[in-house]
Amino acid sequence: MSTSVTLNLHLISDSTCETVASVARSALEHFRSVEVNEFVWSFINNNEQIDKIMSLIEKDKYNFIMYTMFDDELRRYLKQKAGAQEIPCIPVLSHVIREISCYLHIKKDPYISTNIGLDDEYFTRIDAINYTIAHDDGQNLWDIDQADIIILGVSRTSKSPTSIYLAYRGYRVVNIPLVHSINLSVDLSNMKNKLIVGLTIDIDRLIEIRRTRLVSMKNQNNYQYVDYEHVLMEIKETKRICVQNGWPIIDVTQKSVEEIAATIIQYFNKMQH
């Protein structure tokens, strides 16, 4: 597959889509060169909703469906419709459920309420997700004091996916891009009770990721974005700012989003004690 391919990933669930989204993002960590358009379809519980989804899928694109559904009839209907359009349709939990069932020699429960998790914790997560999306890439910093975590880093260091992953865990996150020779647009010196984390990465890996990004955007003429000396200055500036302010730095070179987030959560928990 060409590195410039864009995948339309459709996440479908009869519940909140949190499980299928988590599995999908873990899997996609192994394909960082692929540009992904993510479509989330939650609380799907009848054939008409599936028909609507299938009608909205662009036929001339690379499409991929991942889903969690506990109703056997609905699951079969989705697979039938996806098969008719020759779209891969992968159940993310079926194999695990089947293995547990076989091992224990019992059948799975025929029905699971889709209201599971719709409690205060669920709505806290929704609030965190909304806040984090609104504050992606340095946007809307006027209420940055409402954040739990602030992430800094140069372009393409996994700031946004890490922020969203943390939001799914209930943390309100702001991520701010660091651009060489441009001062931060907000004063973070008075954020003493906030966890501020810097993300860094191996320069060769960063340039590779950026080159792939430029190819996918058909913007190969942006030479400065992948110029070794310029990128090196960006990375050094990030480290300088973080060291100067006593903020922890995480090297994301060999880390998945889950690993980055887990490290950030550890720092956050230490601050609370």
UniProtKB/Swiss-Prot annotation:
InterPro entries: Kinase-pyrophosphorylase, PPDK_reg. Belongs to the pyruvate, phosphate/water dikinase regulatory protein family. PDRP subfamily. Keywords: Kinase, Nucleotide-binding, Serine/threonine-protein kinase, Transferase. It comes from Ehrlichia chaffeensis (strain ATCC CRL-10679 / Arkansas). Its EC number is 2.7.11.32, 2.7.4.27. The keyword Transferase applies. Pfam families: Kinase-PPPase. It catalyses: N(tele)-phospho-L-histidyl/L-threonyl-[pyruvate, phosphate dikinase] + ADP = N(tele)-phospho-L-histidyl/O-phospho-L-threonyl-[pyruvate, phosphate dikinase] + AMP + H(+); N(tele)-phospho-L-histidyl/O-phospho-L-threonyl-[pyruvate, phosphate dikinase] + phosphate + H(+) = N(tele)-phospho-L-histidyl/L-threonyl-[pyruvate, phosphate dikinase] + diphosphate. Bifunctional serine/threonine kinase and phosphorylase involved in the regulation of the pyruvate, phosphate dikinase (PPDK) by catalyzing its phosphorylation/dephosphorylation. The lineage of its organism: Bacteria, Pseudomonadati, Pseudomonadota, Alphaproteobacteria, Rickettsiales. It comes from the Bacteria. It is an enzyme of class 2 (transferase). ADP binds at G153, V154, S155, R156, T157, S158, K159, S160. GO terms for molecular function: ADP binding; ATP binding; phosphotransferase activity, phosphate group as acceptor; protein serine/threonine kinase activity. This is Putative pyruvate, phosphate dikinase regulatory protein.
